[in-house]
């Protein structure tokens, strides 16, 4: 407030000098960036994601609109039930190499490769369902529409304006793709 910190406290292993992964807070930043890009005409909210990322054309995301990604109203088979070892979230994070891959793993090796394996379940636009893959796909759309990486978009549109004392960091996969679904630190 008025240039001064009003309240600051650290719990557990967190310290003023330490890094803290923001996980799903990342989604809010990219929802905001997506809305900014719709407002300035860079993105068409009613266009299919595949307009910006042709690789998504034959995937479950192919006919999902930018608005449906922003609103998380895609009809996708993707569970984030963390108590279920077979939930799709685990394969998603394995693809990005956030978790060790089991011996013989032959699945997707990047976040974007994983998006191409997601199956459709129901219709897009019918109901909200919290699914990290929506924001990961949105990040890909944003990167393509702006010709800038996910990280550069965050830096330019939000981080540089926050007055943050330090740079932000991103979790990346094996090819250097930032995890828009939850990789901000």
Regions found by a protein language model. Give the residues of each.
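Short, conserved catalytic-motif segment at the N-terminal edge
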Residues: 1-22
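A short mid-domain helix/strand-loop element embedded in enzyme catalytic domains
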Residues: 108-109, 129-136
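Active-site SXXK
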Residues: 3, 21-46, 69, 138-142
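Short, charged, amphipathic alpha-helices and their helix-cap/turn boundaries
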Residues: 4-9, 48-51, 85-123, 149-167
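Solvent-exposed loop and edge beta-strand segments that line ligand/cofactor-binding
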Residues: 122-130, 178-185
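Acidic/histidine-rich, surface-exposed loop or edge segments in extracytoplasmic proteins
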Residues: 10-14, 51, 136-137
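Active-site helix/loop module of the DD-peptidase/beta-lactamase fold
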Residues: 21, 39-82, 117, 133, ...
């Amino acid at each position: 407030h008025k240039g001064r910190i009003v309240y600051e406290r650290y719990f557990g292993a967190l310290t003023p000098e330490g890094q803290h992964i923001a996980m799903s807070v990342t989604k809010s930043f990219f929802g905001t960036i997506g809305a900014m890009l719709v407002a300035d005409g860079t993105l068409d909210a009613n266009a299919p994601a595949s307009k910006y990322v042709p690789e998504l054309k034959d995937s479950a995301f192919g006919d999902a609109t930018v608005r449906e990604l922003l609103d998380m109203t895609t009809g996708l088979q993707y569970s984030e039930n963390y108590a279920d070892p077979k939930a799709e979230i685990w394969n998603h994070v394995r693809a990005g190499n956030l978790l060790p891959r089991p011996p013989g793993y032959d699945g997707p090796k990047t976040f974007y490769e994983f998006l191409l394996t997601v199956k459709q379940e129901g219709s897009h636009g019918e109901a909200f369902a919290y699914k990290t893959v929506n924001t990961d796909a949105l990040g890909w759309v944003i990167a393509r529409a702006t010709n800038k990486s996910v990280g550069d978009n965050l830096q330019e549109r939000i981080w540089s304006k926050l007055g943050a004392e330090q740079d932000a960091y991103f979790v990346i996969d094996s090819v250097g793709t930032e995890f828009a679904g939850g990789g901000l630190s």
